[in-house]
């Protein structure tokens, strides 16, 4: 038995008293938790708007703060009998397994199988034990076709699944997940919910920062509500479930009932396409991931000034199609036309703004303000877009200290300021 597991006998696995954390170069505190106790075996949902402190709290639990995100810690936060900030990430990983918003940031190997067995190897588990767990995971999640896949060929949703399963291969008491379903389709979300249920029955302590709340309704024991970096409310399941849709909306939270969300979407007035002229046409495009053919487009037409949604299950070619449209991939057999004029991949690239699923890969500067204007040929006033996208006041923050939602809005803002003809999200 691992020594860290032996230490966790107290039901109070995580406690905080008068705890405050401030990111380096930040004027105001980034997280304040006055009083909190989380017992072993609970599934706790961290909810609140983007930038409310959810990701910061998880970074403290898994040791990324202060090892990778420097700042000032005040008060007391204790995880499995260890004070926050007193252990290295390596030491914390023996107690806490993590799933990040950006799954590629936690991959070390080229192939899926090697990535899955890495945690057990790092923690000195027996080869037989590792293989037994891998076989069980493979059976439970139908991974047979993925084990030999190159991680770089997976879609965003597929990468997120592998990151989750890699965390599940670890022998830890605590599992923290930062928006684990952000890029998953409905079947993938249901698989996550199913396995979280199993882990909860095994007595694991699970902390999930989420905006999607519907799949957690029957799993959550508590909901921690964060607002502007402060833990404002600690709801029991009964208290949270009794909130009205109006109260939930006022808190900036999504519904627990998907049907009500769908009806609201249907009731919204449809946005008419812009009167701009010009169509983008694709002919004879084969969508591939590595050597695997995903689908074939004989002809596809995209109206200028319109919003087009690419929908489908994970791994079916949505992101791959967007890469071709943006000129990031090239198919010599395919034809691209704008207003009837042939386009090369380079032509597509020059006129396209693109926002990746893994937005951290598009952040290069050391402040939000510099990131917004990076590469622009003319000086622009970014105050309006900062205000509109909820980034006002963050101009001096390092982009990598932002929440996942704030990073995404920052990249969207920087791409919009380029004033390219097409935007792909």
Model-based region annotation:
Residues 4-16, 20-34, 65-70, 88, ...:
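A short, flexible loop at the N-terminus of ABC-type nucleotide-binding domains that lies
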Residues 76-91, 335-348:
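ABC ATPase NBD Q-loop/coupling interface
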Residues 128-146, 380-394:
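Conserved ABC ATPase "signature" region
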Residues 150-154, 158, 398-402, 406:
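Conserved ABC ATPase signature
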Residues 164, 412-413:
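Hydrophobic anchor residue at the start of the ABC signature
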Residues 167-168, 416-417:
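ABC ATPase C-loop
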Residues 175-178, 423-425:
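Catalytic Walker B motif of ABC-type/P-loop ATPase nucleotide-binding domains
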Residues 210-211:
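H-loop/switch region of ABC-family ATPase nucleotide-binding domains
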């Amino acid at each position: 038995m691992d020594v860290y597991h032996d230490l966790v006998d107290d039901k109070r696995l995580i406690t905080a008293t008068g705890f405050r954390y401030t990111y380096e170069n930040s004027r105001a505190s980034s997280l304040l938790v006055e009083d909190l106790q989380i017992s072993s075996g609970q599934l706790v949902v961290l909810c609140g708007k983007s930038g409310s402190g959810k990701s910061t709290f998880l970074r403290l639990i898994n040791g990324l703060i202060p090892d990778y995100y420097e700042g000032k810690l005040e008060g007391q936060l204790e995880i499995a009998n260890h004070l926050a900030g007193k252990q290295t990430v390596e030491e914390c990983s023996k107690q806490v397994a993590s799933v990040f918003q950006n799954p590629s940031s936690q991959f070390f190997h080229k192939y899926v199988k090697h990535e899955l067995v890495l945690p057990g190897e790092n923690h000195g588990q027996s080869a037989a034990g590792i293989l037994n767990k891998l076989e069980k995971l493979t059976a439970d999640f139908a991974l047979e076709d993925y084990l030999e896949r190159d991680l770089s060929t997976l879609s965003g949703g597929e990468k997120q699944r592998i990151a989750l399963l890699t965390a599940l291969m670890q022998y830890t008491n605590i599992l923290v997940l930062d928006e684990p379903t952000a890029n998953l389709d409905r079947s993938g979300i249901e698989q996550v919910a199913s396995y979280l249920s199993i882990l909860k029955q095994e007595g694991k302590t699970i902390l999930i920062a989420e905006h999607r709340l519907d799949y957690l309704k029957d799993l959550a024991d508590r909901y921690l509500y964060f607002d502007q970096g402060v833990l404002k409310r600690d709801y029991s399941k009964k208290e949270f479930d009794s909130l009205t849709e109006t109260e939930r909306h006022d808190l900036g939270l999504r519904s627990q009932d998907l049907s009500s969300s769908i009806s609201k979407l249907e009731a919204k007035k449809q946005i008419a396409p812009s009167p701009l002229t010009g169509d983008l046409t694709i002919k004879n495009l084969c969508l591939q991931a590595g050597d695997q053919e995903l689908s074939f487009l004989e002809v596809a037409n995209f109206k200028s000034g319109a919003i087009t949604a690419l929908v489908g299950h994970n791994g079916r070619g949505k992101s791959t199609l967007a890469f071709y449209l943006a000129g990031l991939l090239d198919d010599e057999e395919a034809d691209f036309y704008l207003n009837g004029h042939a386009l090369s991949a380079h032509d597509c690239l020059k006129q396209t703004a693109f926002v990746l699923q893994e937005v951290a890969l598009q952040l290069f500067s050391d402040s939000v303000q510099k990131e917004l204007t990076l590469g622009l040929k003319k000086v622009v006033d970014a105050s309006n877009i900062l205000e509109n996208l909820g980034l006002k006041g963050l101009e001096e923050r390092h982009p990598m200290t932002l929440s996942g939602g704030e990073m995404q809005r920052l990249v969207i803002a920087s791409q919009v300021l380029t004033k390219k003809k097409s935007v792909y999200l």
